[in-house]
Structure formats: structure tokens, C-alpha cells
Amino acid sequence: MPATMPEGTVSFEVAAPIDQVWAFLSDMRRVGGCVPGVQSVEVLDPHRARWNLKVKIGPLSQEFVVLTETLEQVPLQHGRFRGESDNMDMMGTIDLAPLGDATKVTYTMAVQAKGPLARIMDNFMRSKLKSQTEEFAANVKKALEG
């Protein structure tokens, strides 16, 4: 991922076998329910989707339509994706490793704002990405562990 993009990474353990975790994270509709701010996910084809997000920025909220594309999938191990909206670009990876009956998940998301407010938005995203990735991790654990 480009070094200039604000980035957040979180590693966490899920009490579920790796094949179950991979199937969940490969399902854009199901994983969409774990991404903070996602209002809806429209799957366009097996590799592309349209995500509607609502993000709070201080007292304001901003809505985004993000088109995502799966760039790489190594089943049960690694996935790489990108997203684009009118005012931001995103890159992300998910890596899985078996831990007996559990699975270690490492999730990285990088976001770069575009347009006239890019510098301000990048600074905001730098501070927000850590909590966003941690919230995603907690939501995935809850969805898979019950």
C-alpha cells in the first residue's frame, strides 16, 4: 500500500475454523454488516460491489458510495481489495492463519482522500482508522462466534 495513505491494522483471533472465517470474509454482503458506517451493499458480480456508507466526521455526517473490487484471493490465506469513491481511494488486505480450531485474522485498511479537502480528510482518517479497524474486528468476532 502506498506509504502516504493513512493506514490502520488490527490482528485478532476468531474462535472458528479457517474455512468458516474465509467463507464469511469472502461474502461481501455478510462482511458489509461488520464494516462501520455501511448502510447497504449491492453485489455487482463476484469481484465487485457498490457500498453505501455514512461516516461521522465530528458533528457532521458524510455519505459515500464506494465501488470495491477484489484484486486477489488466495483461498484460506489472503485477500486484497480496493475501493474508490468521488472523494477517496481505499486499499485493504485480509490475511488468515490457522490456530488449531481458531483463526488469526490480520486486517489492514488504508484510505486516501481526494479533492480540495484531501489534506484535512487524511489527517482525520489517520486518527479514525485505528478505531474503525478495531470496530470491524469486534464485529467480525461477534458475527462468527455468536
Residue ranges and their predicted role:
Residues 1-50:
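Hydrophobic ligand-binding cavity/cleft-lining segments
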Residues 5-11, 48-50, 65, 78, ...:
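Intrinsic-disorder/low-complexity, polar/charged segments enriched in Ser/Thr/Lys/Arg/Asp/Glu/Gln
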Residues 17, 46, 75, 99-102:
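Short strand-connecting beta-turns/loops that link adjacent beta-strands
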Residues 38-39, 65-72, 91-98, 109:
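Hydrophobic/aromatic beta-strand elements that line small-molecule binding cavities or substrate pockets
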Residues 42-86, 139, 143:
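Glycine-rich portal/gate segments that line the openings of hydrophobic small-molecule binding cavities
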Residues 82-131:
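Beta-strand/loop substructures that line and gate deep hydrophobic ligand-binding cavities in soluble
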Residues 125, 129-145:
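Short amphipathic alpha-helical signal-transduction/dimerization elements
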